[in-house]
A protein has these predicted regions:
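Gly/Ala-rich beta-loop-alpha elbow adjacent to hydrolase catalytic centers
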Residues: 115-119, 123
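Alpha/beta-hydrolase-fold catalytic nucleophile elbow
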Residues: 67, 114, 140-141, 160
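Alpha/beta-hydrolase fold nucleophile elbow
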Residues: 104-116
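A conserved short beta-strand
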Residues: 132-144
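C-terminal catalytic histidine-bearing segment of alpha/beta-hydrolase fold enzymes
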Residues: 160, 165-200
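Short, proline-enriched alpha-helix->beta-strand connector loops that line the catalytic pocket
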Residues: 109, 151-157
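Serine-hydrolase catalytic machinery in alpha/beta-hydrolase-like enzymes
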Residues: 7-28, 32-106
Length: 200
């Protein structure tokens, strides 16, 4: 019998740059549901890094990638301040700008927040301070596990880390969240060092 043709690989995603009034532009991949998926890069990291999983992610909602609010010392990249209220307001404004510009339905009331490294700390803070707006959090490659006082009202938490990255602290954090009765899952990214999403 003839061999079956391999399924076509998905084309890489090309994010759309959307201007936001009185703020930096955001990068957007329109999704298949009305859920906004907020992506926060790492310290001096790459806001386009989410492209590695955008094809899978857009099935769950519209991905909106933000740029940190503080400049790094060298180059043009950015990092995050600890003003969670200001970040939440930035996200709300950006969601509205994306809805207006692209004419797509986005429900701002329930957001998934995804943070990488330093961005995971900001994602944790948003999910802790505003649990109704950020009921689900994905924390990737965090420099520490979530604090014991964090995520008390979260519906679900996913902790991810590269299998070539420091990860014992995140495994232990997952166990602590489980003991607190949280709905939490731990995943390792194959062939991934810090700053990478690996081969999967």
């Amino acid at each position: 019998p003839a061999e079956e043709a391999a399924p076509p690989s998905e084309a890489p995603v090309d994010p759309i740059k959307i201007k936001v009034k009185l703020d930096k532009p955001v990068l957007v991949v329109p999704g298949e549901t009305a859920t906004p998926i907020i992506y926060l890069h790492g310290r001096c990291g790459d806001p386009t890094a989410f492209s590695a999983w955008a094809n899978a992610g857009k099935k769950f909602g519209t991905i909106i990638s933000f740029t940190g609010d503080q400049k790094c010392k060298h180059g043009t990249r950015t990092q995050w301040s600890v003003d969670d209220g200001a970040l939440d307001r930035r996200i709300t404004r950006a969601i509205e700008a994306v809805k207006q510009e692209l004419g797509i339905e986005i429900d701002p009331s329930r957001r998934i927040v995804i943070g990488y490294s330093q961005g995971s700390l900001r994602a944790e803070a948003l999910a802790t301070r505003f649990p109704d707006r950020y009921p689900r959090a994905v924390l990737i490659g965090g420099p520490r596990g979530p604090r014991e006082t964090s995520l008390s009202k979260s519906e679900a938490v996913l902790i991810m880390v590269g299998d070539h990255d420091a990860r014992q602290h995140l495994r232990e954090a997952t166990e602590k969240l489980e003991k607190r009765g949280k709905r939490v899952r731990y995943l390792e990214l194959p062939d991934a060092r810090h700053g990478e999403y690996g081969s999967a």
